[in-house]
């Protein structure tokens, strides 16, 4: 699926839009090993932030150039939407890192943008990478409103969900027993600290640091997912209004509409467990991880089917 010939790579370098996509891929690919090295004890967080910021600027230039070439907002095919999603993921990562400067954030978030750019650059056929005229139904201001908001919601939900996944791994490094939480912010918790061969004061100090980091990740993932959920809600509402204007129906149970609703319900369940049940830590994190699978099915899986109004085409046969 990811096999790219030398001739195809040369052709990509000849197209400035595709070349910018490859440049963003190279920057993100370079950032990943550095971010994981930081997690293991390195101290080059500024380097990763710089690489991700450069990748975001390159993707911005790519989208603006495609917009200028095509004459419409660049989210009309799978290549453009993947690049837009990568742009939104890098932007979300940079915003999250302003709240919590931790190597875990970059190690969890950077691979998502890399996968989006890699899939767009190396897996899609040329027919889905080229700009094409919009069909009449898509020549609407609702295109920018609906699709861009949905893509941004996916980015926020994915970043938040991968931060929740990081909570699962950081929890494993300590014996943390959660009792309750104040609306997902970790307001009250009890921790059972593990004993070790070191003296008690050192053990308490290390466990307190780990607990604080886990709480921060848990709270930050909750807030990021909340933003993504609100954007997803807005995207679904705008999509329904647009559908009614274009086709005379608010909801048609199109495959992507159905899976978008499932996605909304999964993250609604996540927020319910945080807000109403007082869950925090591992249990809501598992719900968020399930949301990642639903987003992948909703965004990529529907295109594998090649059916419905939202499908960009069955790209394995394109």
From Swiss-Prot:
The keyword Transmembrane helix applies. Its main location: membrane. It is a multi-pass membrane protein. Keywords: Cytochrome c-type biogenesis, Membrane, Thylakoid, Transmembrane, Transmembrane helix. GO terms for cellular component: plasma membrane-derived thylakoid membrane. It comes from the Bacteria. GO terms for molecular function: heme binding; heme transmembrane transporter activity. It is found in: Cellular thylakoid membrane. GO terms for biological process: cytochrome complex assembly. This is Cytochrome c biogenesis protein CcsA. The gene is ccsA.
């Amino acid at each position: 699926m990811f096999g790219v010939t030398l001739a195809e790579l040369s052709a990509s370098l000849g197209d400035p839009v595709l070349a910018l996509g490859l440049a963003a891929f190279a920057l993100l690919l370079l950032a990943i090993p550095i971010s994981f090295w930081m997690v293991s004890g390195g101290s080059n967080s500024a380097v990763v932030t710089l690489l991700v910021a450069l990748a975001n600027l390159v993707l911005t230039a790519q989208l603006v150039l495609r917009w200028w070439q095509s004459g419409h907002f660049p989210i009309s095919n799978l290549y453009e939407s993947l690049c837009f999603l990568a742009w939104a993921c890098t932007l979300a990562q940079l915003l999250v890192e302003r709240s919590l400067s931790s190597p875990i954030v970059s190690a969890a978030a950077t691979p998502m943008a890399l996968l989006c750019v890699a899939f767009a650059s190396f897996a899609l056929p040329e027919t889905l990478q080229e700009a094409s005229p919009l069909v009449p139904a898509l020549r609407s201001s609702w295109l920018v409103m609906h699709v861009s908001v949905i893509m941004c919601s996916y980015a926020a939900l994915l970043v938040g969900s991968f931060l929740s996944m990081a909570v699962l791994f950081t929890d494993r490094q300590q014996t943390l027993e959660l009792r309750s939480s104040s609306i997902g912010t970790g307001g009250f918790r009890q921790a059972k600290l593990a004993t070790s061969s070191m003296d008690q004061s050192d053990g308490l100090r290390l466990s307190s640091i780990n607990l604080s980091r886990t709480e921060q990740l848990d709270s930050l993932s909750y807030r990021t997912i909340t933003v993504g959920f609100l954007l997803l809600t807005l995207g679904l509402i705008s999509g329904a209004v647009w559908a009614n204007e274009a086709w005379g129906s608010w909801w048609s149970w199109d495959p992507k509409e159905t899976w978008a609703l499932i996605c909304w319900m999964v993250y609604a369940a996540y927020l319910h467990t945080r807000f109403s049940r007082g869950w925090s830590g591992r249990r809501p994190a598992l719900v968020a991880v399930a949301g990642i699978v639903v987003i992948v099915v909703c965004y990529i899986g529907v295109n594998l089917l090649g059916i419905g109004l939202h499908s960009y085409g069955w790209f394995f046969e394109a």
